[in-house]
From Swiss-Prot:
It comes from the Bacteria. This is Large ribosomal subunit protein bL12. Transmembrane segments: none annotated. The gene is rplL. It comes from Rhodopseudomonas palustris (strain BisA53). The keyword Secreted does not apply.
Length: 123
């Protein structure tokens, strides 16, 4: 049981980019794809969405604009990522910055990023 707790602790300490890399490595090793499960579940969720008000939002950085350094600083402040990870996220736009947040939090993050000069979308 202690081994399982150590694995949980190790996984919890990964950055977003490290977790994404781990997912890719596991997909390759096990011969599976997480995208297939998402694609199957996607249309069913989309059909149900119009009936209810959306409660969870994803803040997507569409582009960094002219003030890339300011946007990188804001992304670091919002996500807690390191400098390299935040720079990679900003340069790889469009990318999600925050996922599964409520409307107020999403609007707050959007305002912070737009103030820094970024173009942001809420999904």
């Amino acid at each position: 049981m202690a081994d399982l707790q150590k694995i949980v602790d190790d996984l919890s300490s990964l950055t977003v980019l490290e977790a994404a890399e781990l997912a890719k490595l596991l997909e390759e090793k096990w011969g599976v794809s997480a995208a297939a499960a998402v694609a199957v579940a996607g249309p069913a969720a989309a059909a149900a969405a119009p009936a209810e008000e959306k409660t969870e939002f994803t803040v997507v950085l569409a582009s960094a604009g002219d003030k890339k350094i300011e946007v990188i600083k804001e992304v670091r402040a919002i996500t807690g990522l390191g400098l390299k990870e935040a720079k990679d996220l900003v340069e790889g736009a469009p990318k999600p910055v925050k996922e599964g947040v409520n409307k107020d939090e999403a609007e707050k993050v959007k305002a912070q990023l737009e103030k820094a000069g970024a173009k942001v979308e809420l999904k």
